[in-house]
């Protein structure tokens, strides 16, 4: 489910026992350029897949594979051998009602160019905070690309603002999803306005929007090393699975063809 969400707005195709997601316009964004749903398991199959990956991502300075419990262990072992670094994601599911009551605040959809400019300003704060948390050197161009990639997803994803006195101070998105399972994602609140119920209000609104579009259960992906997972758990989301991103940064990249 989360793999389908990550592929929204990008080129995707099947080859050599895997699903490829690619966006040559935004080569620095890992989630826009990765491989998932790997079934290659024998040494020959794995060699063929890795060779195809080099062909399809020529000119891009990273390689990322998204894996879960269905991925052949032999393929994951090959990634470990070749020096890929693992980063986990926690998948959480809401089946019933949310536990907390919905705080009162204005929620409105992102629709206009001005809305997207406001989103871009908040996304810049989100990216800077992320860089500081993981002690990464500033890469403002990546933050700008993340903004553009998020916009590619709408529609079918719908972004929402939570506002105080008419000013957008938090955002989140909702997607009706596939096969009756919705997804909510990309939650951020301005650091100066946290603990005022904005995030909780957005979660309520986005879950309701998914269900209004036909979804029953709703999922969210969380960073197991960060604190938002605790908010989701307190509101009724339960952990159901862990999947992993295996990443390798290349020392140099050829010019994209």
Please place each PLM-identified region on the residue numbering:
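Acyl-donor-binding surface of acyltransferase catalytic domains
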Residues: 43-120, 128-131, 244-248
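Short amphipathic alpha-helix that is part of the acyltransferase structural core
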Residues: 1, 34, 40, 90, ...
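Conserved beta-hairpin
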Residues: 12-16, 74-85, 156-172
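Conserved GNAT acetyl-CoA-binding A-motif
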Residues: 58-69, 210-223
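Conserved acetyl-CoA-binding loop-helix of GNAT-fold acetyltransferases
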Residues: 46-53, 185-191, 195-212, 234
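N-terminal charged segments
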Residues: 1-60, 71-72
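A conserved beta-strand-loop-helix scaffold within acyl/acetyltransferase catalytic domains
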Residues: 140-188
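Conserved active-site alpha-helix within GNAT-family acetyltransferase domains
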Residues: 72-86, 200, 224-242
